[in-house]
Amino acid sequence: MLLLVLSTQHFFDRQIQENERNYLQVAMKTVRNDMENRMDEMRKAGLLFAGDSDINKAMYDDRNRLAMALNNLKRNFNYLDYVVIVDRENRILASSSPYLLYPDGSAVKILAASSMLFGKTHVSEEVVGLEELFTKDSFEYDNFSIKILNQFPGAQEYLHKALMGIVVVPIRDKSADNDVIGAIVLCDVLNNDNYFAERYSRNMDNSFLAFSIDGIRIASNIQTDTKSNFVGSRAPHETGKYLEDDKQYFGKVDVDDEIHVFLDQKIFNSADEPIAVVGIGIPEEKFSGIVSNNYKYVLGLFFL
């Protein structure tokens, strides 16, 4: 009898773990689909902008017209945090903020140059230093900086890196053999942005999402009974345990005295380098409660 109970318990333990993994695998696909849909929307917006005949004419001598068009674009797509229009020499003609930077050698500028050189739309996820994007002490720079939690008393350490989706669309002169005469660059910064996390949790009950750079959470809606803000906290597990085959890691972690099962997946940039992590998790008791009822039901049948 004891052997049967133990074997049944072992079976249900394995079932729980398998269900957890399968659930999170499916959930991860919904997150990545949402992210890809956002990038595709940015791409389509860039293509419409670049294909506008008025924009085409304004590229030569009407910066005011470009600035007005860019402001309209921002109003329609208010999640865009960094937008520039550049000429064929990769010089700024209009930008979404007076505090926006576009220095030589920056990742964004290099990607824009490549897009114009090959005449192809570029879409990728990148991690870029905030000093390449905005002037220090600007609202944008401060808003996207992540204060690292649980430091020594008096310490004020920040993460000054941004995870963002970037789209570059070449602008062509329709009256001159379709030559590339510039580009529009659109970026959506994920730091301190709960759009994907909130959307995810609406679709997946009792489940949470977080993005992290260098092991620091930059956006998160993780909640426990005692804590509701985990932005700036460190991911407690070792990223070196990732499975290289599928570039992800499944495991359990103690989140503020609450055990969560989680699935982490690496995010790669245009150079196919791992730059960040997207992680999803759910309190283990949410799974355990469901399967525990099945376990009790089976034992009940045996003793009838």
What are these regions (language model features)?
Residues I171-A176, V253-H260, I267-S270:
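Sensor-regulatory modules in signal-transduction proteins
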Residues V86-A94, G215-I218:
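Short, glycine-anchored, charge-dense loop/turn motifs used at functional sites
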Residues M1-N64, N71-D81, R88, H122-G129, ...:
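Juxtamembrane extracytoplasmic/periplasmic/luminal helical "stalk" adjacent to the first N-terminal
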Residues G279, E284-L304:
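Cytoplasm-proximal transmembrane signaling helix
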Residues N64-L70, S96-E157, D193-D205, N221-V255:
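Extracytoplasmic/periplasmic sensor domains and loops in membrane signaling proteins
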Residues A58-D61, S96-P103, K174-L186, N192, ...:
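Membrane-proximal N-terminal soluble sensing/regulatory segments of transmembrane proteins
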Residues V167, I181-L190, V261-S288:
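Short, hydrophobic beta-strand elements of compact beta-sandwich sensory domains
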